[in-house]
Structure formats: C-alpha cells, structure tokens
A protein has these predicted regions:
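Acidic, metal/ion-coordinating pockets
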Residues: 1-177
Length: 177
C-alpha cells in the first residue's frame, strides 16, 4: 500500500492474496500502512456482506477486519477530481478470488448486484462524469465464468472496469454497450 501511495495511485481494492496471511496479516498490513504516515491509496470495496455476517454474529477475525477497514477508511466508492473531470471509483471482489482465498473469513455479495446498487447511489448523490470499477474478479475464456465481462454487461453505467485477478493479457480492450 505504501508503494502504491508512493506511485500516486489513487485507489485500490482487495485481492485474494491479501488474505494469504489470514485476517491478522491483512489487518496488520492495513494498520501499518495507515500508521506509517506515508501516502496510501484509498481502499474501495462495495460487496462485503457485513449484514449477513453481523446477523450471524461477527467472529473475532471478522471483527478484526471490520475494525481495520474502518480505521483505514475503506469505503464502497470514492470520488476523484482529475482536472475538470469527476470520477467515481468503486471496488469489487469476485467469486473466483474468494475461491482462491481459503483463509478469507468474509462473506461477499454478488459483484453485479453490489455494483448496481453502488452505481445507483453514485448517480443519485454525486455529480460525476465517469464511473470506474477496480475489480479483483477477472476475465475467463469461458464467458459464463468471465466475471468482469458479466459485470460490464449487467451494469452498463460503469464506464471502465480495471480488471485484475486472472492475469489475462488483452491486446485490445473489451467493450460492451
């Protein structure tokens, strides 16, 4: 996170490898980055399912992460001003990412539903020129498993999806809508 901040990255989201050292490792990394005083990017993620986890009673690890996310300032989205352009940036964490993070204790909502809800909120409450999604969901040769392509089709109000997770090189951008 400190390196991303040094590179002047404005926003990021979580990926499956953030859970490699369990909840305590992720919480520790977030807290250390925040406490360093160095610039760090905003953390955006709109599809954590806190409601269902809280209904069941948060585990110690879930509470640890909730506290670390709050202290870091994680939000569903942020709005950036780049010159005369206002850009909303939201983040999502996909199903395949979760499948690749066996130590993750969090529950997540469907990325399409969460992104649609967040985009609706952005459009109703913010005056933005563009909506960008940073996604750790990925693309896949199998269209039924290509989460970011499915997201683009389901939520056409998203202008740009910056897709991570699958390490796919695209020679040309994928365009929908």
């Amino acid at each position: 996170l400190r390196m991303l901040g040094a590179l002047e990255c404005d926003a990021t989201t979580l990926g499956n490898h953030e859970f490699d050292y369990r909840s305590s490792g992720l919480a520790g990394a977030l807290n250390a980055a925040r406490e360093s005083g160095d610039p760090v990017p905003a953390m955006v993620l709109c599809n954590i399912d806190w409601k269902s986890m809280e209904a069941e009673g948060l585990t110690e690890d879930q509470q640890l992460l909730k506290d670390a996310f709050a202290a870091y300032g994680m939000r569903d989205y942020i709005v950036l001003n780049k010159g005369d352009v206002r850009i909303a940036v939201l983040g999502v964490f996909g199903e395949d990412s979760l499948a690749c993070a066996p130590t993750c204790v969090l529950k997540f909502q469907d990325i399409k539903e969460a992104a649609a809800r967040t985009v609706k909120e952005i459009r109703e409450t913010e005056d933005v020129d563009m909506i960008v999604c940073v996604s750790h969901s990925g693309t896949n040769e199998d269209p039924a498993k290509s989460e970011d392509e499915l997201l683009a089709k389901a939520v056409p109000e998203i202008d740009l999806i910056i897709s991570g997770h699958s390490h796919t090189t695209l020679e040309q951008p994928l365009q929908y809508g």
